[in-house]
Amino acid sequence: GFSGEVLYAPYGQRWAVGADLNQVWKRDFNQRLGFQDYEVLTGHLSINYEFPSPRVLATARAGRYLARDVGATFELTRIFESGVRLGGFFTLTDVSSAEFGEGSFDKGISLSLPLDLLLTNSSRRVSAMTLRPLFRDGGQMVNVSSGLYSAIGKYSRGSLDLGWNRFLD
């Protein structure tokens, strides 16, 4: 599929707003170049705010998901000085509890570990995982490897404040 994203993140501010749009097709079961008869246009508006102490990133997204359901996702992520990120999220959409099945809505926790912590040499790579109690169609987003906010996160107000404080120590 195709994906695009825009982000407005004023320098020195703790907030950012963005939008993404994705046109995707479902691949054939044999994983070759064919597609199934399913395509969807998804998109979300997002707002991010980074609280200063302790460093917590709050994100809210609203839009259309892969199952053509409409709703919102809310995330809170604690960012530790080591670069470790631990977060939780939940998604509420127009899919009824009866349609969604057990669990009623999508939810889970995420963990991101910088490989720098585990290796003897410097690395910018990160190992990330998301744990969900159940996988259902409702509330699922396109999995984009790296969004714009995460790409500029090291230049956020919280990161700059932390770096400056370390420089002065």
Predicted regions mapped to residue ranges:
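Outer-membrane beta-barrel translocator/pore domains, especially the C-terminal barrels
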Residues: 28-32, 42-44
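Outer-membrane beta-barrel initiation region
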Residues: 33-37, 169
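Outer-membrane beta-barrel "beta-signal"
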Residues: 103-169
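Transmembrane beta-strand segments that form the barrel wall of outer-membrane beta-barrel proteins
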Residues: 1, 17-25, 29, 55-65, ...
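Short flexible/disordered coil segments
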Residues: 12-13, 52-59, 82-93, 120-134, ...
